[in-house]
């Protein structure tokens, strides 16, 4: 029980840092200074008003000084990070893979939210993440360096092909190159099978959300939501359950074989 509490606190603390990253990185601000302040009145936030989730609840989602509303994104990111860490712990306990996967999950959360709010996927996250994933593959038993490289090339290459084909047909970008670099990271950490699983699931979920928005709006409604917003949660789902789902799917064909 003590370990679970520590992991929850660890996840909430990392989530608080991710909130800083999500807000500041797209604005090219330093991640460490100046200290956090209210976006409405610029009053510096005291440490006791910056406790993950708890401060938001005690302040009822408002700044102590100007009563300006605090976005729900802050507690949401903190809770998502804590839950992600708990899910990873439930599968891998306190292993090296657990800590590495926590970093991968943090990268996905940051990329997903930044893409949702700013429609960019910063290289400052994807490229260092790719490098760490490749280095980590040297110490893994489930995925070696060769497989990590194949995963990166396969995932990003397929998306790059779609990018080029769409541009040739429509004369405009259907995907951003940031999605391609994000798939380099995803493929390097998960391998080619789970990279394709991520792409298929993200496309399916994105299509469902798109259909929902189209039905809720007028017929000429132009639906647009960054693909990285879907890649992030589906890549995490692939990390947790991807291999089991793929194996279960393939076993169906084996059972159908006469």
What do the predicted segments below correspond to?
Residues 18, 22, 84, 88, ...:
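Alpha-helical membrane-inserting segments
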Residues 1-13, 85, 89, 134-141, ...:
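Hydrophobic alpha-helical transmembrane segments
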Residues 7, 98, 103-106, 110-205, ...:
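Functional transmembrane core segments of multi-pass inner-membrane proteins
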Residues 72-77, 123:
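Select subsegments of transmembrane alpha-helices in polytopic membrane proteins
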Residues 177-178, 211-236:
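Interfacial loop-to-transmembrane junctions
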Residues 18-73, 227:
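Membrane-proximal soluble regions of multi-pass membrane proteins
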Residues 19-24, 60-68, 108-118, 162-173, ...:
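C-terminal ends of transmembrane helices
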Residues 193-223:
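Conserved post-catalytic alpha-helical subdomain immediately downstream of the catalytic base
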